[in-house]
Amino acid sequence: MRNQFICVALLLCALNSACGLYFHISETERKCFIEEVPDETTVIVNYKVELYDPRSNGFMPSSPGIGMHVEVRDSDDKVILSRVYSSQGRISFTSHTPGEHVICMYSNSTAWFSGAQLRVHLDIQVGEHAIDYANVAQKEKLTELQLRIRQLLDQVDQITKEQNYQRYREERFRHTSESTNSRVLWWSLAQTVVLVCMGFWQMRHLKSFFEAKKLV
């Protein structure tokens, strides 16, 4: 029983699908991030843009005219979100197909002076980590116990989605492996047939040559 509890705890820790980082982009540069997301899972992206100030040699809050164009594509390369946001915001979308989702960001401004840079702070949260439970408790008037039960139910639901996604990946990998093995087999058979045909042709050619020279 204790070992089962430890396994569940480790699995819950592994599901902590949130990452915070920052990156620099230039005027026309495009940055993309890949996030593996199960189906019917909420993803929230928080970002903040800072503009490089050469006078202070640091990054300052960007002007209101500078924003970010955000584009999200699902595992089928279908655009599920594409629009221009302000210099700081919160983006939310729900996946409808499991797999790799590509989140791309680039500036909507092309009027910067030469050498300007943007620093973009980015935080991506997936699954139950994207839910604001304080807001949920206030909106639905939940007690502390009810809220905790709600969190546990969401975690179980996320674990189920993750398991289904892993099964989906295993099935896709197995299908790819079987397809590759089948192609290798047919290619080997084709090579064998070609070699046999070439050997047969060479034997007939040599026989004709020897007969022409009256050696046989």
Swiss-Prot record:
Signal peptide: 1-20
Keywords assigned: Coiled coil, Developmental protein, Endoplasmic reticulum, Membrane, Signal, Transmembrane, Transmembrane helix
Stretches assigned to coiled coil: 134-164
Residues in compartment: Lumenal: 21-183
Protein topology in the membrane: Single-pass type I membrane protein
InterPro entries attached to this UniProt entry: Emp24-like (IPR015720), GOLD_dom (IPR009038)
Chief location of this protein within or outside the cell: endoplasmic reticulum
Any one GO biological process: dorsal/ventral pattern formation
Segments in the Cytoplasmic topological domain: 204-216
S-S pairs: none
Domain GOLD: 30-126
Record keyword Endoplasmic reticulum present: yes
Cell compartment(s), UniProt: Endoplasmic reticulum membrane
Membrane-spanning residues: 184-203
GO cellular component terms listed in the entry, alphabetical order: endoplasmic reticulum membrane
Pfam short name (any one): EMP24_GP25L
Motif annotated as Prevents secretion from ER, chain positions: 213-216
Function of the protein: Eca and bai are essential, though not redundant, for dorsoventral patterning of the embryo. Specifically required during early embryogenesis for the activity of maternal tkv, while the zygotic tkv is not affected. Involved in Golgi organization.
Protein family membership: Belongs to the EMP24/GP25L family.
Protein name listed in UniProt: Transmembrane emp24 domain-containing protein eca
The organism's taxonomic lineage, starting at the top: Eukaryota, Metazoa, Ecdysozoa, Arthropoda, Hexapoda
